[in-house]
């Protein structure tokens, strides 16, 4: 299985330059492709899946057509269930609190 990670950096809109008084957040999205959902019996009016449990990229460079084909079942990556995990990390810069 090959994972793809997308990182987005967000800052507040009124922040043209970075200062210590504003907060920004970091959003990390990890995309994973699960079981194959291709209906192999659609041509005859039935429903049958091949049982492939997760996408494994074929031998190919990232971004080529070969990398979009599953090595286990031979289907295109779009037939596999897409799972997105999103993690938001706040980079908050707040003054330390006093124990009153």
From Swiss-Prot:
GO cellular component: cytoplasm; nucleus
PROSITE patterns: ZF_HD_DIMER (PS51523)
GO-annotated biological processes: floral meristem determinacy; plant-type ovary development
GO molecular function: DNA binding; protein homodimerization activity; zinc ion binding
Zinc finger (ZF-HD dimerization-type): 33-83
Subcellular localization, as worded in the UniProt entry: Cytoplasm
Stretches for region Disordered: 1-26
Annotated tissue distribution: Mostly expressed in stems, flowers and siliques, and, to a lower extent, in inflorescence.
Keywords: Cytoplasm, Developmental protein, Metal-binding, Transcription, Transcription regulation, Zinc, Zinc-finger
The keyword Ion transport is annotated on this UniProt entry: no
UniProt function note: Inhibits zinc finger homeodomain (ZHD) transcription factors by interacting with them to prevent both their nuclear localization and their DNA-binding properties. Involved in integrating signals from multiple hormones by regulating the expression of specific genes.
Quaternary context: Homo- and heterodimers. Interacts with ZHD1, ZHD3, ZHD5, ZHD8, ZHD10 and ZHD13.
Protein name per the record: Mini zinc finger protein 2
Taxonomic source organism: Arabidopsis thaliana
Source lineage: Eukaryota, Viridiplantae, Streptophyta, Embryophyta, Tracheophyta
